[in-house]
From Swiss-Prot:
InterPro entries: MraZ, MraZ_C, MraZ_dom, MraZ_N, MraZ_sf, SpoVT-AbrB_dom, SpoVT-AbrB_sf. This is Transcriptional regulator MraZ. Gene3D superfamilies: Transcriptional regulator MraZ domain. It comes from Pseudomonas syringae pv. syringae (strain B728a). One of its GO terms (cellular component) is cytoplasm. The lineage of its organism: Bacteria, Pseudomonadati, Pseudomonadota, Gammaproteobacteria, Pseudomonadales. Belongs to the MraZ family.
Length: 151
């Protein structure tokens, strides 16, 4: 499981270094093979170990193709998916088109989301984190299904 938020630098060639604390798990789960695609809701990228992505692809494949919203989601996620591999130094190249979509430039946040990571522009992530915290603290903002969650 991937958790935590990590500030990392995007180099001039568009490469990011995966923090070492995640590398062993990525190696064991998918031999360092990753898939990056756009997030269909937020202005960020989703980075999956190949084994996790294959589960998502199977679910997308099984969607009814006569529904336009299903085809749209398939086009967005699968059409923008790119295979990546960690190099010997634990780096991977984020394709220019995807960097542009997420507005990634120099400082990037790699955010663990249990089965995947999100890649955010650092300023966008900080603004969202502040907004999320303010929103969840408002009275009545907690969804019913979370009210009984024990932390």
């Amino acid at each position: 499981m991937f958790r935590g938020a990590n500030a990392i630098n995007l180099d001039a060639k568009g490469r990011l270094a995966m923090p070492s604390r995640y590398r062993d798990e990525l190696d064991s789960r998918s031999a360092g093979q990753l898939i990056v695609t756009i997030d269909a809701v937020d202005p960020c990228l989703c980075l999956y170990p190949l084994s996790e992505w294959e589960l998502i692809e199977a679910k997308l494949r099984d969607l009814a193709t006569f529904r336009e919203e299903n085809r749209r989601l398939q086009r967005l996620l699968i059409g923008n998916a790119v295979d990546l591999e960690l190099d010997g130094s634990g780096r991977f190249l984020v394709p220019p088109r995807l960097r542009e979509y997420a507005k990634l430039d120099k400082r990037v946040m790699l955010v663990g989301q249990l089965n995947k990571f999100q890649l955010w522009d650092e300023d966008a992530w900080n603004a969202l984190a502040d907004a999320d915290l303010a929103a969840i603290q408002k009275p009545g903002a907690m969804p019913d299904e979370l009210r009984d969650l024990i932390l």
